[in-house]
């Protein structure tokens, strides 16, 4: 098998395409969360502490712990959103898996009943 053909099969697999879409959406979502934290949440926190520019004003001798705190808030929001999204997806997929199993069990029961009836008739 040629290298190009192998790469084509690899790149067209569903998992690779799903990963590519996830990376693009994740990058866009990261920008939204960064804006939410920088433009909405941190100014509110800054007002509580008496300053509206929390990230740049909270520094000590070049150590910008305000920016670090802002990054932690970014991370917590992203992690929470991803957790809720994955939880929702798992709930949806579990329901469909249960339905598939129930359908398979019903189909197997029908087939076994037919086989039993055929064996009885012999």
Swiss-Prot record:
Keyword set, alphabetical order: Cell membrane, Ion channel, Ion transport, Membrane, Transmembrane, Transmembrane helix, Transport
GO molecular function terms attached to this record: mechanosensitive monoatomic ion channel activity
Keyword Membrane in record: yes
Major localization listed first in the record, in broad terms: membrane
Record's keyword annotation contains Transmembrane helix: yes
Localisation: Cell membrane
GO CC entries: plasma membrane
Pfam short name (any one): MscL
Transmembrane segments: 29-49, 66-86
Bilayer topology term: Multi-pass membrane protein
NCBIfam families xrefs: mscL, PRK13954.1
Family: Belongs to the MscL family.
Subunit architecture: Homopentamer.
Its biological purpose: Channel that opens in response to stretch forces in the membrane lipid bilayer. May participate in the regulation of osmotic pressure changes within the cell.
Name of the protein this chain belongs to: Large-conductance mechanosensitive channel
Organism: Macrococcus caseolyticus (strain JCSC5402) (Macrococcoides caseolyticum)
């Amino acid at each position: 098998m040629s290298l190009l053909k192998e790469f084509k099969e690899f790149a067209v697999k569903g998992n690779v395409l799903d990963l590519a879409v996830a990376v693009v959406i994740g990058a866009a979502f990261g920008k939204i969360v960064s804006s939410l934290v920088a433009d909405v949440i941190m100014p509110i926190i800054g007002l509580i502490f008496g300053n509206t520019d929390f990230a740049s004003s909270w520094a000590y001798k070049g150590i910008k712990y305000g920016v670090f705190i802002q990054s932690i808030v970014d991370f917590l929001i992203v992690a929470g959103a991803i957790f809720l999204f994955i939880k929702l997806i798992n709930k949806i997929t579990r329901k469909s898996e249960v339905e598939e199993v129930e359908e398979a069990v019903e189909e197997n029961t029908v087939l076994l009943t037919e086989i039993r009836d055929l064996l009885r008739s012999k």
